Amino acid sequence: AWNGMAISSLVSAFRATRNPKYLEVAQEAANVLLLKLWLPDKLVHSDISTQEGFLDDYAYVEKALLDLYDVDKNPRWLEKARDFNALVLQRFLEQDSGKFLYAARAASSASSSSSGSTQALASAKTYATTDGTWPGAAGVAIENLIRLDALPKVARDGTTGPDYLAIARRSLAASGRAMQEDPVAHASMLVALERLLRVRTSFGQN
């Protein structure tokens, strides 16, 4: 998660100052991250472990890739963001409830103690809906869905993605009562909801 946050911060610095050095460092960091932490079928939590990352690792890196694509239009970032999103939906989205889990449903079966912790989190159905010292992973993941819906839909292999907005709406609805009862703890979810409402308003004006 920290790597994704750092890359997004560098992109924000570039937007504010137009200093190309910030963008260059962000691009380099993203390339290193994809080289070191991205395995063929998962994002690992660190470069010294094969433990799969948690939802915040995926969501924040996906956000960083979308932020990079917004400023440099490199299609590689968008393709990788789609790859990350596909795994988020496959491994972290609980189909029955529409909520996002903090640990992947198909947790690693490795016998390390860290892997056991991951499996315990998955079996306990720890949801990622509330904010802590940074925005909650579910809110970021939902906002990523809404952003992806506004971008080119056809992937490199000619396929189109899922109905991103429908998934976002369902996930927000699943936490609707919690957002009403404790909006401060669900600020990132409310930010995602506000973005979704802006999308619906713009459709209505077309």
Give a label for each model feature.
Residues 1-206:
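Glycan-recognition and catalytic cores of secretory/periplasmic carbohydrate-active enzymes
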